[in-house]
């Protein structure tokens, strides 16, 4: 069960990701258990868990990072709060913040390990999961099954927990989203999103180049 007590507002050092992060994972978006949107109201993009074989020491739990989707199949319409699919080539992939779980989800007692990624709106947009924001509506995108997704995991938030109720699980995921947002807003992490040539190190630029190249 989740321990009682307040949550830390950020995760990871302010100076930026430390080994083993960033962790690179990629794959086509596949169908998951079908619970994210329908039961929890929290849409997720699942990718095959086989990529975890490269990282045998990566523990199960909740993480934060950044994602990009193949722009030949999916384009984020920045500034409109919506998304669309497209087959037009030449567009650059949008880099978006994400919170994700790797593991078995003890509340549902899954038998197989999964990677479930919730893609959040740009950090410049109002947070739909902020405390006191009214009714929580997690960020939703149109379906994009089969689209290639790339993920850089930048930090670890917490272990997996079981919960006394579905509502308690949803509330902890809401807090996960806020921890991820606040963590990614720090300059050493924001570079992975905005790619500022003046502020980013060569290492960050190389990681970001991998992220947006399809």
Curated annotation (Swiss-Prot):
Gene Ontology CC: one annotated term: mitochondrion
Task: Recall the GO molecular function terms of this protein's record.
Answer: ATP binding; metal ion binding; riboflavin kinase activity
Q: Which of this chain's residues are annotated to bind Mg(2+)?
A: 44, 46
The chemistry this enzyme catalyses reads:
riboflavin + ATP = FMN + ADP + H(+)
Record EC number: 2.7.1.26
Against Gene3D superfamilies, the record matches this protein to: Riboflavin kinase-like
Alphabetical UniProt keywords: ATP-binding, Flavoprotein, FMN, Kinase, Magnesium, Metal-binding, Nucleotide-binding, Transferase, Zinc
Q: Identify the catalytic residues.
A: 116 (nucleophile)
* Top-rank lineage group of the source organism: Eukaryota
Task: Check the record and name the Pfam families matching this protein.
Answer: Flavokinase (PF01687)
Q: In which pathway does it act?
A: Cofactor biosynthesis; FMN biosynthesis; FMN from riboflavin (ATP route): step 1/1
Keyword Cytoplasm (UniProt) = no
**Keyword rRNA processing part of the UniProt annotation:** no
Its required cofactor(s), as named, are: Zn(2+); Mg(2+)
Q: Which family does it belong to?
A: Belongs to the flavokinase family.
* Protein name per its UniProtKB record: Riboflavin kinase
Organism field: Aspergillus fumigatus (strain ATCC MYA-4609 / CBS 101355 / FGSC A1100 / Af293) (Neosartorya fumigata)
């Amino acid at each position: 069960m989740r321990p009682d007590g307040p949550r830390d507002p950020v995760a990871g050092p302010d100076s930026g990701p430390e080994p083993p992060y960033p962790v690179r994972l990629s794959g086509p978006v596949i169908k998951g258990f079908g619970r994210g949107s329908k039961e929890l109201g929290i849409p997720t993009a699942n990718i095959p868990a086989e990529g975890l074989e490269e990282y045998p020491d990566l523990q199960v739990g909740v993480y934060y990072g950044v994602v990009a989707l193949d722009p030949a199949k999916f384009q984020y319409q920045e500034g409109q709060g919506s998304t669309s699919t497209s087959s037009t080539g030449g567009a650059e992939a949008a880099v978006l913040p994400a919170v994700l779980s790797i593991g078995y989800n003890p509340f549902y007692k899954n038998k197989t390990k999964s990677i479930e990624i919730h893609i959040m709106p740009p950090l410049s947009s109002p947070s739909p999961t902020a405390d006191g924001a009214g009714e929580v509506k997690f960020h939703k995108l149109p379906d994009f099954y089969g689209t290639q997704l790339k993920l850089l995991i930048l930090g670890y938030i917490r272990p997996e927990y079981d919960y006394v109720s579905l509502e308690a699980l949803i509330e902890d995921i809401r807090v996960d989203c806020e921890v991820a947002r606040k963590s990614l807003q720090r300059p050493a992490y924001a570079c992975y999103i905005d790619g500022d040539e003046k502020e980013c190190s060569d290492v960050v630029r190389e990681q970001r180049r991998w992220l947006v190249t399809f």
